[in-house]
Amino acid sequence: SAASDVYKRQPIRQYPEPAFWRAPIDNDFGNKMPVLAGVWRTAHANRYVKKVTIGENNEKGLSVRVDWVLSDIQVPYTMEYLVRDNGTVIVTGSIDLTGTKLPELPRFGMRMELHQPYENLTYYGRGPFENYIDRYSGAFIGRYEDKVENQFYWYIRPQETGNKTDVRWLTLLDSGGLGVKITGLQPISFSALHFSPEDLDPVSYTHLR
């Protein structure tokens, strides 16, 4: 049926949600980050909607604002969507930490999940190997193509991996050239993996640390 065909071609399994945690690296354990900042590990998961505001449809598009409260830490988080006439959606996330005494934020961004076939990665940013804000001078800006399965680096202990910095845009496509394109309003960092941060940092695997 037409409905099932549309579903099969829908690339997004889990739409963007807030992301505050990354799998700790070896240095983080020396700094006790997993313990000191552990409240951020699940802060994205326990939340409730406080208010939804739908704006007027104008020449910029249709805006939808969702005000959340992060239940575990009682902090407001806002996601705004601007749906434009050309089919693109601008997604913006913001958090208000005014007056809080929370620990250092390991990461601020969003995460989403795609269906499995979108294995072909192309991006314009620093590469071709993983790079981070504190180690990227050897990774030059360019256009890179690779498979998602190659973005994971086999460290001795599973940890944060695969990040790319100064990225202007990226695409994840299937064998037929269908998929998604993500463009930053400013240079962004991203990782595209077959693993979630939880997979790389299972709390119960203390014997690996």
Q: Where are the predicted features?
A:
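Beta-strand/loop-rich accessory regions of lumenal/periplasmic or secreted enzymes
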Residues: 1-209
